[in-house]
């Protein structure tokens, strides 16, 4: 089982699109694949599960979800009843693995553990109770059930992102060719290296995924060359901009199912092949 985190502390760089489309290609190639959505915006969840995973003031988040899992990790009884009831609740929650929170997507071999908009509210209590390794332990129990796991993370270095990095083998870093993304990259890589040193020496930076790359424009080419000159692991397969991505989001269909021969789909295919060879 191979577990990848798609992570960037900067928002708007295509984390969810990259997560879902690589996962969809993985599943399309016959690999049993799971997407875990740790971003309260739930873009990956909605991309794959459509209206079922949308939420609003009048519509709660789809359950069970990743927030429910972390609530169960905390072991808080649902009621303030007798001690026996409390202990029974704790034992029941302890026995429940991550597979109890999985939803099947409409696509063969592709499952999802959806996010919840209120997930962030649990971060402080999870930190205070030292639950940072629980996701890693839960994923180890899934070994044999999935070939590939992709984790979408929030645009912040917080409890949930750190949990994902501790649980993963590899991290993919989406990158837009602008000065703000480049400035944020050093801090991001420092955080990953610190996680390697302190928590997870198995974790590898699989590469920087250049998204929205305009090959005809001078600035993107210069920025990418600067990254390479600095010795950063820029992946050769880059993702061009295309309006078809918006159509893919709107129809809740990953590119491999919506337009398999499109140039952006083919770019994703090349990217998947490149990272799988590592």
Predicted regions span which residues?
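P-loop NTP-binding core
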Residues: 1-278
């Amino acid at each position: 089982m191979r577990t990848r985190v798609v992570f960037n502390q900067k928002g708007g760089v295509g984390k969810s699109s990259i997560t879902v489309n690589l996962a969809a290609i993985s599943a399309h190639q016959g690999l049993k694949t799971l997407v875990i959505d740790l971003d309260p915006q739930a873009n990956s969840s909605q991309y794959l599960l459509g209206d079922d995973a949308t939420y609003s003031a009048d519509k709660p988040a789809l359950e069970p979800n990743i927030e429910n899992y972390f609530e169960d990790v905390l072991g808080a009884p649902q009621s303030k009843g007798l001690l026996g009831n409390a202990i029974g609740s704790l034992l029941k929650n302890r026995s429940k693995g991550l597979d109890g929170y999985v939803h099947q997507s409409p696509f063969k071999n592709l499952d999802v553990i959806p996010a919840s908009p209120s997930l962030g509210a649990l971060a402080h209590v999870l930190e205070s109770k030292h639950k940072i390794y629980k996701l890693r332990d839960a994923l180890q129990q899934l070994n044999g059930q999935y070939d590939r796991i992709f984790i979408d993370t929030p645009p912040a270095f917080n409890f949930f992102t750190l949990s994902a990095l501790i649980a993963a083998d590899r991290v993919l870093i989406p990158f837009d060719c602008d000065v703000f993304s480049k400035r944020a990259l050093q801090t991001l890589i420092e955080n990953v290296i610190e996680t390697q040193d302190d928590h997870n020496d198995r974790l590898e930076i699989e590469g920087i995924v250049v998204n929205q790359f305009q090959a005809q424009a001078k600035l993107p080419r210069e920025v990418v060359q600067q990254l390479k000159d600095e010795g950063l692991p820029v992946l050769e397969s880059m993702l061009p901009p295309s309006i078809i991505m918006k159509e893919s989001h709107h129809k809740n269909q990953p590119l491999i199912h919506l337009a398999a021969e499109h140039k952006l789909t083919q770019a994703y295919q090349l990217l998947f092949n490149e990272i799988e060879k590592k």
